[in-house]
UniProtKB/Swiss-Prot annotation:
Disulfide-linked positions: none
The organism of origin for this protein: Treponema denticola (strain ATCC 35405 / DSM 14222 / CIP 103919 / JCM 8153 / KCTC 15104)
Keywords: ATP-binding, Magnesium, Nucleotide-binding, Transferase, tRNA processing
Site keyed Interaction with substrate tRNA: positions: 116, 138
Residues that, per the record, bind substrate: 11-16
Binding-site positions, ATP: 9-16
NCBIfam families, sorted: miaA
Protein name: tRNA dimethylallyltransferase 1
């Protein structure tokens, strides 16, 4: 059985910096001292469970790890897809299932880290068995989305599968179409195809969630968005637009990118950046709230309120204890 650490936190909660502090090679001696384990086994590799960091050319808006963080701690599934390509939960589970045993064979701990709840939940429980995609049905709904807009399809979805429609955003065209596909093929709503009740038995999971007070999390979101603009987020989006990517590209439907485009899919002018920034902050806060709500539905989660130094110490010790499984 392969031990896997799931490291979850809402956007802007500080996952990347905390993971770098805990798992990087430069801190391995501290791990050895704290947990009574060798420096060699006190190393991990990160599997990014972030649906935006998977895309190339989107470093700033996705808050991807810095060059120094990537050099110090191995990361996987970062910048592996073009913004025009889809990357689904099934794709993530397939890739993570290959990576976890490989990392474990190297004597390291696989750490799934991110905030894309859909990725993590499907990896934890396994994918629900849904009807195979029918290319003709998919093409039909893709054509309708292009001609009528995904908003029309989402409104229709509310009538046949309100549970799925409730958790989808109008920009999530891929999943809106998939929900229609499933209903058209089976006559059943996608929400009726439930995940298995228990976590997959091929892994031994340690699930942790880093948490902050809502007010401080929102403050961090405000500061991070400001920092992204200062770092050159507009130029990053402009370059993507010049490369031929638009708000219809899967990668650019993400929060932090879609707000830069008007209703005609044109890039907004620099004079609108104040409004764009406000939209990104608002949408990111709403997303963070949904992330927190979602993760409360997962049982057996170890929660750490990292504004308290004692909680960070407890987190550190708990991870060290889980690391010992590598030596068995």
């Amino acid at each position: 059985m392969v031990p896997v650490l799931i490291f979850f936190g809402a956007t802007a909660s500080g996952k990347t910096s905390l993971a770098s502090e805990i798992f990087s090679y430069k801190h391995s001696k501290d791990f050895s001292k704290e947990g009574g384990i060798s420096a060699l086994s006190a190393c991990a590799e990160i599997i990014s469970a972030d649906s935006v960091q998977v895309y190339k050319h989107m470093h700033i808006g996705s808050a991807s790890p810095s060059k120094e963080e990537l050099e110090d701690l191995p990361h996987h599934l970062i910048a592996i897809k073009e913004p025009s390509e889809e990357f689904s939960a099934a794709d993530f589970v397939k890739e993570a299932d290959k990576l976890c045993p490989e990392i474990y064979r190297r004597g390291k701990l696989p750490v799934l880290m991110g905030g894309t709840a859909f990725f993590l939940k499907n990896f934890l429980y396994g994918l629900p068995v849904t009807p195979t995609a029918d290319p003709k049905i998919r093409e039909h709904f893709q054509k309708r989305a292009k001609e009528e807009g995904a908003g029309i399809l989402l409104e229709e979805l509310k009538k046949i599968d309100p549970e799925t429609a409730e958790r989808l955003h109008v920009h999530d065209e891929y999943r809106i179409i998939r929900a229609h596909e499933v209903f058209a093929a089976s006559g059943k709503p996608l929400s009726s195809f439930a995940l298995p009740e228990n976590p997959r038995e091929k892994y031994e999971f340690f699930i942790l969630s880093i948490e902050r007070t809502r007010s401080l999390l929102y403050e961090r979101i405000e500061k991070r968005v400001d920092a992204m603009f200062a770092e050159g987020l507009y130029d990053e989006v402009k370059k993507l637009y010049e490369m031929g990517y638009t708000s219809e590209s899967p990668g650019l439907k993400a929060i932090g990118y879609r707000e830069f485009f008007d209703e005609n899919k044109r890039l907004k002018p620099e004079s609108d950046l104040e409004e764009v920034s406000a939209l990104i902050k608002r949408n990111t806060k709403h997303y963070a709230k949904r992330q927190e709500t979602f993760f409360k539905t997962i049982p057996d989660v170890h929660r750490y309120f990292i504004e308290d130094k004692a909680e960070i110490s407890r987190l550190y010790k708990d991870i060290c204890g889980f690391y010992k499984k590598l030596l068995k």
